[in-house]
Amino acid sequence: MTKAGLVVVAMATALGTSACGGGQAGATSGNGGAPPAHGKAPSAAPSGDGTRSRSAPASPAAVERLSANARSGASSLTRRVPWNLDILDQRSRPLNGKLTTAATGKGVHVYVIDTGMDIAHKEFGGRARLGADFVGPKDSGDCFGEDGVGHGTFVAGVIGGAKYGVAPKADLVRVQGIVCESEGGGSTPAAAEAALVKSVKWVTAHAQKPAVVNMSLNLDHRSAALETAVKKMVDAGIPTVVSAGNYHDDACKHSPAGVPGTIVVAASTPTDRAWNDSGSYGSGYGRCVDLYAPGQKVTAALSGGGTATEDGGATSWAAPHATGVIALYLSAHPHATAQQVHVWLDHTATRGVLRGVRSDTPNRLLDTGGI
């Protein structure tokens, strides 16, 4: 695999939506309604990295109590892993080739709103199941990009793959809300957005807690309908992780990254830089971003079987790392609120280690916080 940027599998050029697994989506905006007036405003809590956190205020002692509660009574699991997992439990270089956690994600339901999921994949070990399909005939597969990678399967693999996933025992739920490019046909931007809205509403109504949602996708505009649905999902107590987008612009300009309470993840590289290929192609940035996570040279499951390393960068690959870490935390601390999860994730991140991060964007790198 040479470029994750080829994996434009969801409502891209024709439909004005990007599954953020690379590839610059088209500029067809559709209207989608006006965005909420409030945008995604920061709170008064200092982030400690030169920017202001959007999370709920919390003292360092309170955050440490959350981490301690998560670690209590758990035995550690150490695995040999590629760099994108290795870095999650290390504050500094060099990496040691291992990931050690005190939790596995067991008992946590992860809802992956995406192009589909190969639920029979060996990496998922029988832990993946069909939740709902709002875009086409039900099947157990996934869409394929130009390079043969199933976007949703790869994302799910980062979250909960047995060998290459952050939370190797989490339960994965397929929620197909993104139209495959090959199935574009008579679809329209409005129809594509409607499928996403239905997906979000379904998760809000049917989620089994503890639960977390992954949305490795972005519209190329703001949609009041989608943002309203996502806000209700967050308000229902479900942590919701969103990719910052591959447009290399302000993540706040896109839905659902502009929704208050969502956890927005930008992409970093193996050399500890903010991912930016060139020009208008790179990670989203700005005050709506919560933190960075590995988004280049990521290894995970391929639809149809096997695994591969995606050499190119994508925020779609970054977001599921954060989702997996949340699954780890929730498996050890299942009664944590969405707000507590959000605060904990932001405050346990490693600060100031990335290069090429804009001054208007938090310089925070995802960390497991010892869970």
Regions found by a protein language model. Name each.
Residues 22-23, 30-77, 82-86, 174, ...:
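C-terminal subdomain of the subtilisin-like protease fold in secreted/lumenal serine endopeptidases
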Residues 16-19:
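C-terminal motif of bacterial Sec signal peptides marking the signal peptidase cleavage site
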Residues 238, 254-331, 335, 342-343, ...:
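Extracellular S/T/G-rich loop segment that most often corresponds to the catalytic His/Ser-adjacent loop
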Residues 178-261, 281, 285, 303-320, ...:
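Substrate-binding/access-modulating region of protease and related hydrolase catalytic domains
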Residues 72-112, 135-147, 232, 273, ...:
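N-terminal domain-start motif of subtilase-like serine proteases
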Residues 92, 116-117, 121, 125-128, ...:
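Sec/Tat-exported extracytoplasmic proteins
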